[in-house]
UniProtKB/Swiss-Prot annotation:
InterPro entries: Ribosomal_uS10, Ribosomal_uS10_CS, Ribosomal_uS10_dom, Ribosomal_uS10_dom_sf. This is Small ribosomal subunit protein uS10. Belongs to the universal ribosomal protein uS10 family. Keywords: Ribonucleoprotein, Ribosomal protein. One of its GO terms (molecular function) is tRNA binding. It comes from Methylobacterium nodulans (strain LMG 21967 / CNCM I-2342 / ORS 2060). It comes from the Bacteria. PROSITE patterns: RIBOSOMAL_S10.
Length: 102
């Protein structure tokens, strides 16, 4: 696969699971002889939701909830066929969204 790169984008709500999955992908790629660029942390997306604490009155009493989406990007430069096979067989933790672009 000469001159081709694989870009892997990872998303998760928990940064610890995301980092462990990233380490697993990097070690698998390096073990099969590919060069890895990254992991590059992307900006964390924070969604905030504001709701009333009471269902009836007290408009001034509110509560805020937030959801943080952590993201990482990996580039695998000049992957070998063994690298692609190993990445396809890799079983990552639940809760990690993986996007792969060739």
């Amino acid at each position: 696969m000469n001159g081709q790169n694989i870009r892997i984008r990872l998303k998760a709500f928990d940064h610890r699971i995301l980092d462990s999955s990233t380490r697993e992908i990097v070690s698998t790629a390096k073990r099969t002889g590919a060069q890895v660029r990254g992991p590059i942390p992307l900006p964390t997306r924070i969604e905030r939701f504001t709701v009333n604490r009471s269902p009836h009155i007290d408009k001034k009493s509110r509560e805020q909830f937030e959801m943080r989406t952590h993201k990482r990007v990996l580039d695998i430069v000049d992957p070998t066929p063994q690298t692609v096979d190993a990445l396809m067989k890799l079983d990552l933790a639940a809760g990690v969204d993986v996007e792969i672009k060739l």
